[in-house]
Amino acid sequence: MSGRARVRARGITTGHSAREVERAPRDLMVTSVSPGDNEASSRTSVISQPHELGVSSGDGRRTLVEKRGNGRQDFVDLGVCTREKLTHVKDSKTGSSGIPVQLATNLFHLDLPQDWQLYQYHVTYSPDLASRRLRTALLYNHSILSDKAKAFDGTSLFLSEKLDHKVTELTSETQRGETVKITLTLTSELFPNSPMCIQFFNVIFRKIFKKLSMYQIGRNYYKPSEPVEIPQYKLSLWPGFAISVSRFESKLLVNADVNYKVLRNETVLEFMTDLCLRTDMSCFTETCHKQLVGLIVLTRYNNKTYRIDDIDWSVKPTHAFQKRDGSETTYVDYYKQQYDITLSDLNQPVLVSLLKRRRNDNSEPQMVHLIPELCFLTGLTSQATSDFRLMKAVAEETRLSPMGRQQQLARLADDIQRNQVTRFELETWGLHFGSQLSLTGRVVPSEKILLQDHTCQPAFAADWSKDMRSCKVLSSEPLNTWLIVCCSRAEHLIESFLSCLRRVGGSTGFSVGHPKIIKVDENPAAFLRAIQLHVNPDVQLVMCILPSNQKNYYDSIKRYLSSDCPVPSQCVLTRTLNKQGMMLSVATKIAMQMTCKLGGELWAVEIPLKSLMVVGIDICRDALSKDVAVVGFVASINSRITRWFSRCVLQRTAADIADCLKVCMTGALNKWYKHNHDLPARIIAYRDGVGNGQLKAVLEYEVPQLLSSVTECGSDARSCRLSVVVVRKRCLLRLFAESGHTLQNPPLGTVVDSEATRPEWYDFYLTSQTANRGTVSPTYYNVIYDDNALKPDHMQRLTFKLCHLYYNWQGVISVPAPCQYAHKLTFLVAQSIHKEPSLELANKLFYL
């Protein structure tokens, strides 16, 4: 790129940075860079002196200290060692129960010499040089470094071999004749298992993927040269890989998984044009702003992604900007000269994207101007994700079978091992990309489902929906006084629906009385007025049959009935009741939800531990106010783990760390005491929604809140024992069961607690779901605090049991039920209610 545009902010409010946004191309970045020379003469001298500096990475762009502010956070977690404090698993954290199963993985060995080390040097220049390109050229021109593997980010130099002295001074001369003194000071000798070294390995693999002609978008790498087109929906899929290097137990392994980037073959300009045709011109700019700000776009001329932070309607492509050399050019001329692109619409505005700041960087915000015509929308809209046919078309291309996924991974390994350039890059650093890891897992026994009059062992262990149709639930409250609010065109569907609902209720033990039916006009305000008029203290439940899935119908009803006038509610779409052939299935699901919302219990599994409370905690961001965190807390209040206490708290915090857990836990313990006349002997809390780099904060800030509540509520004679388990549904690991010459998904209940786990943590993987198509993902569990000192077998088996207790699905789910309940609660509040639900509903699963 020959120039760098300097675009100034025009009163734009800084928005939240998107995780996927890459650094801008140098052509349109707002920054001041001093011009410099490319070549220089040099001479070397050596001097020894003490020097202590902060550690930095070999990123090539930012120091590690800077990256911690807005880069990869998962490396920070590697410094949190929890297992050493858990004496019962200090020697061994592996279980022994279950049937052994041979598993292949998507982990590859990264081999290196036994005495391998990495040496990090801090590099200073006198006088200081602003240009990293010039810094690199002057440094690399010295013969002392010419035969060594090296990586330099402008501040830190990484070498595979140690220099003769701790401090080395070099002297260079620029083409202008200026003398520059370069000082290299050894700051760290890094071993392969150090977090800094782990990050360096990831940097090396970023270079390798670049050499394989892949482009980095967010954390993943894609091949735009091999797109998969879905023309009927104007979509393109870029195949690629997610990759991470880390130490698993005693081995350094590369974790690689197949990934796809969904791109729309629709530019922002086309989107704006279509929106203009459908919107009144008086509110077009406002509507356009609401629709586009926050979206991620891709510029295909450089394969970079950006987050749209604003739209500048005052700037057009014909406007001029100043390049790095001081000359001016227009956007039209710039794109023609740089990319041979001719802009067709000279009246379009420009999009504004704010770039991520470096940590402790107080300089002017950097931003880029983007041309809508050249920006392609990424991802899928909520409307698209609700389109069954569209999602099916996407799934047919992306939902790979275990064998299909393995073939893609084998191809990647072959590319890395056979490509001369990538192999040389690895060999330069003494690394070798090795074979795939295979290991032995265990399959824990399937669970029996306990009902009121029957114990069933489902024929298909992951699904017992057929068994539920003819068996009575554990307990239910009769529904005598309730309302149905509907519009006139849905009235004819009510009688057949009620008939089917009573039929289902008769077989499951759920008594359904005749409701009061209220007809209203087809608008959200009419529904809300009818509810306000007819709901009284005797009403047990309100059912609303909605004419469409417009969000304002659902939101206004749920907000009023969850907070202002707390009554359980059930929303059903008219088109759902129109599916006469599926009415029995629809009525069964609705009956189950209504039973739960009235405080009923559907089924149970055998829990050997008595007086056990399980807790689920989840955190997300409010959809309307991104500075508001929504904390969901759900705890069991009986030994059978079938009744729940639910509370949601809104807090204003920058990080997704809860500060309300003490009050939530105290409320749960009080409810438990009210039901059982004693406190629980054990509490196991499952914490979902923990982001990368937050493990230490959870351990040091959230766990003490729970402990404080437990200590204050407990008596001197006996205090509750607490365990805290971090849950992660999204993990890179994939497991494939080896069956002859083919691979298939691992059996339900497969546990992996060795080789693919971390030595510093008490962790395991559990596969608690099945898939007819595609590849199953295991869920990752990390026990960070454990006063209960349960054996690994018992912790793993209990976790699997809890995956059977989610009442909104008659089958096994991927996480323990309290986690999923907490997720459903936070989702409802963050997306629809935007305020704390009334505690009058705390004993009911009103959010299902």
From Swiss-Prot:
SMART domains: PAZ, Piwi. InterPro entries: PAZ_dom, PAZ_dom_sf, Piwi, RNaseH-like_sf, RNaseH_sf. Residues 541-834 form the Piwi domain. Keywords: Cytoplasm, Developmental protein, Differentiation, Meiosis, Methylation, Nucleus, RNA-binding, RNA-mediated gene silencing, Spermatogenesis, Translation regulation. GO terms for molecular function: molecular adaptor activity; piRNA binding; RNA endonuclease activity. Disulfide bonds: none annotated. One of its GO terms (biological process) is cell differentiation. Pfam families: PAZ, Piwi, Piwi_N. Plays a central role during spermatogenesis by repressing transposable elements and preventing their mobilization, which is essential for the germline integrity. Acts via the piRNA metabolic process, which mediates the repression of transposable elements during meiosis by forming complexes composed of piRNAs and Piwi proteins. The PIWIL4-piRNA pathway acts in the nucleus and mediates silencing of active transposons: engages with nascent transposable element transcripts and governs the piRNA-directed DNA methylation and subsequent repression of transposons. Belongs to the argonaute family. Piwi subfamily. This is Piwi-like protein 4. The gene is Piwil4.
